């Protein structure tokens, strides 16, 4: 019940903020850009033991991680496994090939000259799962510094969740939103998809801030 109340408050707040920004023509662009940048993580990057991709970062994550590898920020990449779900298994039963997203990303990395790619043998369905399993995996492998590549619109909330999961575990984790993400924080209001992402992700971020004010 409390989460639902916080979610409603967050949604109303975001909707009003967007409406006000659009209505106030003289400062409209600055306000809209500020709302977009509100979603983006601002962690400082440092040389890392490994770069890990969010499950939903897709090609944008592969491109960003490849750039970091070529800039010698890290020398290896990891991504979560993508085992078939019940729908995929039914397609397999009917003789239709399953396109494993993790395998596709590995192929893309190899094509871009990145050979040190590891698949984390854990199936995750969201950021909370990612944060829990990533913290455990890093501890198991002795990784102390990690860069986690997410989509831009999801990066700030991801940074908060990851910080809670890794606190006290001796892991320094930085979150980076891929510059190749479809979401543009400086022009999101120019497309229906951008507006939808801004409202949904702002609602989730504000709800997280209300539930975990000291993250």
PLM segments and residue spans:
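A transmembrane-helix-recognition feature enriched in membrane-embedded lipid enzymes
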Residues: 191-215
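N-terminal type II signal-anchor transmembrane helix
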Residues: 2-41
């Amino acid at each position: 019940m409390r989460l639902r109340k916080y979610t409603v408050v967050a949604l109303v707040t975001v909707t009003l903020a967007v409406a006000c920004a659009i209505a106030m023509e003289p400062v409209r662009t600055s306000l809209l850009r500020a709302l977009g940048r509100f979603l983006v993580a601002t962690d400082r990057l440092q040389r890392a033991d490994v770069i890990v991709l969010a499950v939903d970062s897709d090609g944008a994550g592969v491109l960003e991680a490849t750039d970091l590898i070529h800039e010698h920020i890290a020398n290896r990449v990891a991504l979560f496994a993508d085992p078939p779900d019940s729908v995929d298994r039914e397609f397999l039963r009917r003789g239709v090939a399953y396109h494993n997203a993790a395998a596709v990303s590995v192929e893309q990395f190899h094509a871009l000259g990145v050979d040190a790619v590891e698949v984390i043998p854990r199936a995750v369905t969201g950021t909370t799962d990612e944060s829990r399993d990533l913290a455990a995996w890093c501890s198991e492998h002795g990784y102390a510094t990690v860069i986690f590549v997410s989509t831009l619109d999801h990066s700030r909330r991801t940074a908060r969740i990851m910080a809670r999961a890794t606190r006290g575990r001796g892991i320094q984790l930085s979150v980076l939103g891929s510059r190749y993400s479809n979401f543009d924080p400086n022009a999101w209001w120019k497309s229906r998809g951008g507006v939808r992402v801004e409202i949904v992700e702002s609602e989730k971020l504000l709800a997280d801030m209300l539930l975990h004010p000291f993250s």
